[in-house]
């Protein structure tokens, strides 16, 4: 709709679109947000097995930085920027968390066929059925080249939010 408006209104202003992947990172309030809940489920052991799901991760601070960079860069006009630092499977997130002291994270990864069976018993998992086993590959090349965007490692962001949730007593 925004692109259509710009086109139909004879370019009344500049427009750049920022499309982040799964936005994660420490919260400035007690509300951890929906995206971080996926990390909480893995870190707390509420996800007893690592299902074959892959997500692209990007830190909320890096999304904010990309917005500022786009506003400051005239070359961003008319561009769409995908933002992702890294694509990770849940099993990789679980391994990272276990390595850093979150011993409730799942140690066993299930294959797609078993995850599909398990989805019959979990409404959250049932929502992911179309994405099970699908490898994603979002590239942020344009944001890096045009905006000079340089995101922090996804692993750092995952550990930041996991540690914050642990400190707040949210991982039980």
Where are these regions (language model features)?
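Active-site Tyr-X1-5-Lys
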Residues: 1-16
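Glycine/proline-rich active-site loop of Rossmann-fold NAD(P)-dependent oxidoreductases
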Residues: 10-13, 25-38, 70-80
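Conserved SDR Rossmann-fold cofactor-binding beta-strand/turn motif
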Residues: 19-20
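A conserved pocket-lining segment of Rossmann-fold NAD(P)-dependent short-chain dehydrogenase/reductase
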Residues: 23, 29-30, 36-62
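Glycine-rich Rossmann NAD(P)(H)-binding loop
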Residues: 25, 50-53, 81-88, 98-99, ...
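Mid/C-terminal beta-alpha module of Rossmann-like enzyme folds, strongest
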Residues: 66-126, 156-172
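Conserved C-terminal active-site "lid" loop/helix of NAD(P)H-dependent oxidoreductases
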Residues: 118-150
């Amino acid at each position: 709709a925004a692109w259509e408006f710009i086109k139909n209104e004879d370019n009344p202003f500049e427009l750049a679109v920022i499309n982040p992947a799964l936005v994660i990172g420490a919260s400035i309030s007690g509300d951890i947000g929906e995206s971080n809940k996926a990390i909480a489920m893995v870190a707390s052991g509420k996800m007893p097995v690592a299902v074959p799901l892959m997500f692209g991760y990007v830190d909320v601070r890096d999304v904010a930085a990309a917005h500022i960079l786009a506003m400051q860069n005239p070359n961003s006009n008319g561009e769409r920027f995908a933002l992702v630092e890294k694509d990770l499977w849940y099993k990789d997130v679980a391994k990272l968390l276990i390595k850093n002291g979150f011993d409730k994270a799942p140690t066993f990864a299930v294959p797609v066929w078993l995850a599909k069976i398990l989805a019959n018993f979990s409404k959250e998992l049932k929502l992911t059925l179309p994405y099970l086993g699908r490898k994603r590959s979002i590239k942020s090349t344009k944001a890096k080249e045009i905006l000079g965007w340089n995101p922090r490692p996804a692993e750092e962001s995952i550990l930041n939010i996991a540690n914050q949730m642990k400190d707040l007593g949210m991982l039980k």
